[in-house]
Amino acid sequence: MSDAGVEEVDPSRWVEITRENPDHSSWYVERFRTMAAAGDDLDGESRFVDAMVARRARILDAGCGPGRVGSALARAGHEVVGVDVDPVLIAAAEQDHPGPRWLVGDLAELDLPARGITEGFDAIVCAGNVMPFLAPSTRVTVLERFRRHLRPGGRIAVGFGAGREYDFDEFLADAERAGLDAGVLLESWDLRPFTHASEFLVAILTP
């Protein structure tokens, strides 16, 4: 408990990494700027989510980083809010991708109505290996908070790779504990079917 009597959440692995290496966030930003300048295809996740929703949908980019996914969805005509725990990444998103609303915040404490964003979302996208970077103690809480921010009929798209100290079966069990059904499982953002040999998981979750 904090001095104010409010229970504190464990810091994410990303927070721990950036505490140990303060230059890590800037390196991450420049890495994706370089890839974008080289013409690399960075829009696989955004194409996937765009196909899930109607035009002018409300989309939450959860763990948005420097805004790669959310900005592409905004260019496609959607109303995007992006949240990330790292202020360096949010500053880069604001600089490189004006338009969406970019917010600093811990996903384990996600409460957008308290920040004046009262309308729910048609889709939540959590890409870029965000889930394995969470503190293990907060994973179910984060998924529960995602569920609470959905509009009726809304869906959550989560993607992350194997070998990151978060087994796919464990994630699916956490989703169930959070009141979510993983009705669609894929091994990539380009709709390849998931198998037990898959090294990547894309899960579509619904309440």
Q: Which residues are covered by each model-predicted region?
A:
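A short SAM/SAH-binding and catalytic strip from SAM-dependent methyltransferases
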Residues: 122-137
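Class I S-adenosyl-L-methionine
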Residues: 174, 180-207
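A short acidic, Gly/Pro-enriched loop at the edge of an enzyme's catalytic core
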Residues: 112-123
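Class I SAM-dependent methyltransferase SAM/SAH-binding core
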Residues: 66-111
